[in-house]
Amino acid sequence: MPKREDIKKVLLIGSGPITIGQAAEFDFSGSQACRSLKEEGIKVVLVNSNPATIMTDPEMADSVYIEPLDAKIVEKIIEKERPDGIIAGIGGQTGLNITSELAEKGVFEKYGVEILGTPVEAIKNTEDRELFKETMLRIGEKVPLSRAVNSLKEAEDVVDELGLPLIVRPAYTLGGAGGGIARTKEELLEITERGLRRSRINQVLIEESVLGWAEIEYEVMRDENDTCIVICNMENIDPMGVHTGESAVVAPSQTLSDAEHQMLRSASIKIIRALKIEGGCNIQYALKEGDYRVVEVNPRVSRSSALASKATGYPIARVTAKIAIGMKLDEIINNVTKSTPASFEPALDYVITKIPRWPFDKFTTADKTLTTAMKSTGEVMAIGRTIEESLLKAFKSLDIDNQLGNKHWDEPETKTLLKTPTSERLFVIFDALEKGMSVKEIFELSSINPFFISKIKRIVDMEKRIRAEELTPELLREAKKMGFPDTRLAELTGSTRQEISDLRHKAGILATFKMVDTCAAEFEAATPYYYSTYEDSCETNATTDKKKILILGAGPIRIGQGIEFDYCTVHAVTALREEGIETHIINNNPETVSTDFDTSDKLFFEPLTLEYVMNVIEREKPDGVLVQFGGQTSVNLAIPLKQELKRRTDLNTVILGTDPDDMDLAEDREKFYILMKELGVPQPEGGYATSHKEAIEVAKRIGFPVLVRPSYVLGGRAMEIVYDEIDLERYMKEAVRVSHEHPILIDDFLEAASEIDVDAVCDQKDVIIGAIMEHIEEAGVHSGDSACVIPPQSLSPEVLDQVRDYTRKIALALKVKGLINIQMAEKCGKVYVLEANPRSSRTIPFVSKSVGIPLAKIAAKVIAGHSLKSLGYTDEPKPKHVSIKEVLLPFDKLPGADPVLGPEMKSTGEVMGIDYDFGRAYYKAELAADNVLPLTGKVFLSIRNADKTELVDVAKKLQAAGLELMGTEGTVNYLARHGVFMDVVKKVHDGSPNVIDMMRRDEVDLIINTPTSKQSRRDGSRIRRAAVDFKVPYITTMQAAIAAAAAIETMKKGEELTIKSINEYHKEMEN
């Protein structure tokens, strides 16, 4: 039966901002679904709040709404667009929750919208923990003993019934949010309280512990005809007790017997049929010695399905979208082979390993223990012929300093860390084996299958051989087959990476490339992708006559380097393909659009290091390499890559775009300072130091407070505002460790300055400014954590002219070819340049969506040889609407972290609010970031003295809008002197009843708390942490409070929010 003819227009709900538990995998699946529906001639309406996604590009759907993912707003879009159907399972947990809410309210019935694919009943039967348990038991499938509870009293009763430890799983939440493992009654009550608040239906499931059992996942697909296939099975290296998003995962499963595989395969098909899921679905099992329990089912595209897609080459989201419009598996052609139907089960002749990337370098106070709730921000995937090879390649892909064998622990610490899962457990296993601990001992402490421990032992044993023996060509070949990178071999033999590389080439030990083709080479692949290994035959050939360009991707999503850089990579690829250039990508992130099978002409799933990039260059011999689109990861490779290409006279590949030496000039603060002086561009006074003594001298010369940071960092890592000598000494002790022989930079901190961001494209003759952004938070909050607005709201025309002038001067002086981002600050009408980055920036997608011009695409075309004039870009765009970028902070997923902003970046993702005035746009942005500004209720104020003069106006606006105010004594007395009267609430350290008690009773609707001295900072920290834990909107800077008051004032005037697609906003700009 072909596709349904009655479905002409479909609504897709995206997943919103990148957050812990929901990363870029839904951009990848959403983009694939959009293309899949459009192939069938169906009109697509898309709603998503995240501008950094490919799926929100105006050309991805017929109408793209960048609006808050809020049920009321989605209802207005349905009313306006009148779609025939909605597909819920593409937008992750967010999409499912909104679909369920709209169905319950009767919205679909009211507007005649059909839920396509997986029915709401199936969503309920999987997401509602009690219904799920009943369904499984009805079909004879075993689940852990459990009880669904709606209150703390009910939770207490479960302890007597099931004993401890217990697992807590909230209903309808994301990445296990709000859940955890309770080993005591106190822990159970604490986790249950958190879980009930997080759950959409105020329900958590408390279940018996299956800690230590193996965790196995099956990715299954079903169509309306009841045809089912198993796409992939995966095995978690960590046993049950660690969320699958937090565990290292291998595919296919390695320790299952054939009988166990057949048993779980049959159960998977039985489950997907019983639940009547149509499309892709993920089923998780706990397994122990032939016995199993069904842990959970995700009736949607998920993180695991993104991994399964990349592991097998099977486009799960594409097929799911086609099934949703009535197509059958045997009617859908597999796009990788172009000849086999989607009903063929994929076959793998390689091993993949996924390892998560955690943000603990940014959150030193956060609890690093891994549990059933996620804490990682992203992940890498590596492909090899063996587990050892794919594991070593995965570690190399993480882009972290710490590699296997580089870190050591003493014996008591080793035993503790083996028992407790943390982000370092695999490193600890390596160290324990190196010190002689047996596989059996490690298994008994960690419950990790001895099979995996013995594989790590093989790597340890090989390292011992390399240290002890001469590195002969035979041993070198053996080590390379096992996955050892040249850098590690150099460390083990006391030589350099270059010497190892030369030794390899001399012995003819070169990387070969194998294909991922969904069918273990049984059929010819039309759009294959590749991984490197050390075998005899090579499956890639470099035969075309077309010009070839290799683009370096951004690697795993982490704080400071998010999905924005994948967006830039994909845009660059698209632009070059439009020019008839053959494009190749190297990347290792399974969640992204750039690693989709048909984004580029060739995809190489490899670590982003010099060795692996050179392997591809040697094999493919591209004309050029692009490094400016993949964020700091690819920029860091620019100089070493340029040097290596210069050394290799047999290669004619060059780095395209801005010259790496000019990029380096911008990164090197001293050289950049000299250049700015020559151009007559003001900078904050600064200096650099390599010792404590020098640092104190520089700071005294400039005067405290100063901004200190290491050179060459991403996302403000180890950046701080320092107020006195003691603080500076502590910083020097901590920061020198992360600075790699580079000096510490010390700048005058411009207090109370407005920060400005500019994104521009330069072709070495002309410069086009995409937008000037004004930050809402003042200087001192990392630009990646500040909300910003286009067009600027408070900067004078004279200041804006200075900004434009400096942008042009700097771009031309740095000989930029492509993108440049410049950060500036304005104080008392004078503009200072803080830094320039001649590469893609995290604001490129936001600017492109806001002003309607694709900056990354334009930059790629400039690099390919076009001038800005020939492309028709000469004037800075002037939008008629206001766009606000707001960030999403991950504090709710990281117990223990203080939710305060500073110069080190902490946000994981972003949202965008668009309307015709600042107030409505800001209200939308906060709504989209799940920091909903209240229009009624109580506001608690506790403000440091320095901010109190600005507070009066804010307090008056809030009171005039009908909100009730309360605060601590100092704030109350100050406001009373200025005619604003409110109730006094005790400080936290003065005992109860205080604001935390009120939050617990749901008596506070907004917290405005700016941090100050150490004692109050402790109080403030507890208030802010409680606001996160009790889901109370909170504000920690005065500038955000001023913006919030303006938004609340606008909304109270009864102004309607504008519901328009970005396609419509962009059209208005053309007129």
From Swiss-Prot:
Binds 4 Mg(2+) or Mn(2+) ions per subunit. Residues 133-325, 673-864 form the ATP-grasp domain. Keywords: Amino-acid biosynthesis, Arginine biosynthesis, ATP-binding, Ligase, Magnesium, Manganese, Metal-binding, Nucleotide-binding, Pyrimidine biosynthesis, Repeat. Residues 1-399 are annotated as: Carboxyphosphate synthetic domain. It catalyses: hydrogencarbonate + L-glutamine + 2 ATP + H2O = carbamoyl phosphate + L-glutamate + 2 ADP + phosphate + 2 H(+). Mg(2+) 2 binds at E296, N298. Transmembrane segments: none annotated. Mn(2+) 1 binds at Q284, E296. ATP 1 binds at R129, R169, G175, G176, E208, V210, E215, G241, V242, H243, Q284, E296. Composed of two chains; the small (or glutamine) chain promotes the hydrolysis of glutamine to ammonia, which is used by the large (or ammonia) chain to synthesize carbamoyl phosphate. Tetramer of heterodimers (alpha,beta)4. Large subunit of the glutamine-dependent carbamoyl phosphate synthetase (CPSase). CPSase catalyzes the formation of carbamoyl phosphate from the ammonia moiety of glutamine, carbonate, and phosphate donated by ATP, constituting the first step of 2 biosynthetic pathways, one leading to arginine and/or urea and the other to pyrimidine nucleotides. This is Carbamoyl phosphate synthase large chain. It comes from Methanosarcina barkeri (strain Fusaro / DSM 804).
